[in-house]
Amino acid sequence: MNVTAIYPGTFDPITLGHADLVGRASRIFDRVILAVAESKAKTPLFDFGERLALAREAVAEMPNVEVVGFNSLLVDCARTHGATVILRGLRAVSDFEFEFQMAGMNRSLGPEIETIFLTPGESYAFLSSSVIREIAKFGGDVSAFVPGHVRAALMRKFAGSG
């Protein structure tokens, strides 16, 4: 059985926690789609193209991982790419309620697609893209939390601000 999982998010920016989860998923599933949401509801720091490029570079060494962009219902994106599993990370109990609601809605819209939760590695349980952006905005060192190319992109974004 060939199983494809889809891992959606805005990835603004992608962190080592995201990359760790994708790497672990790539050992479980035959194929992993990292799906970058265009997300017009949010005001991202990095535009859609930048987020796609940063994500692609972050997973470049993972041969069974592919990065795609989407601006549709997640279940429609999953179907388009042949994914039968939605992969979500749970950092804390506080994430559970929202993720539980989303899993129920996705199951309602796409009953053939299962949602599976992975917990982060201990080193990454506290990471979030919004916290990373805030640290970088004020000149803090984010090198332990994001890939080097993401750190450089953050530094360029915030050059002269903060």
Curated annotation (Swiss-Prot):
* Annotated site (Transition state stabilizer): 18
List where this protein forms a coiled coil. Answer: none
Annotated Gene Ontology cellular component terms: cytoplasm
Which residues of this UniProt protein bind ATP?
A: 10-11, 18, 89-91, 99, 124-130
Which UniProt keywords are listed?
ATP-binding, Coenzyme A biosynthesis, Cytoplasm, Magnesium, Nucleotide-binding, Nucleotidyltransferase, Transferase
For this protein, what reaction is catalysed?
Answer: (R)-4'-phosphopantetheine + ATP + H(+) = 3'-dephospho-CoA + diphosphate
Q: What domain of life is recorded for the organism? A: Bacteria
Please state the pathway this protein functions in, per its UniProt record. Cofactor biosynthesis; coenzyme A biosynthesis; CoA from (R)-pantothenate: step 4/5
Q: Look up the record and name the cofactor or cofactors this protein needs.
A: Mg(2+)
Please give the subunit comment from the record.
Homohexamer.
Q: Which NCBIfam families match?
A: coaD_prev_kdtB, cyt_tran_rel
Report the sequence similarity comment from the record: Belongs to the bacterial CoaD family.
Report the protein's function: Reversibly transfers an adenylyl group from ATP to 4'-phosphopantetheine, yielding dephospho-CoA (dPCoA) and pyrophosphate.
Official protein name in the record: Phosphopantetheine adenylyltransferase
Q: What is the lineage of its organism?
A: Bacteria, Pseudomonadati, Pseudomonadota, Gammaproteobacteria, Methylococcales
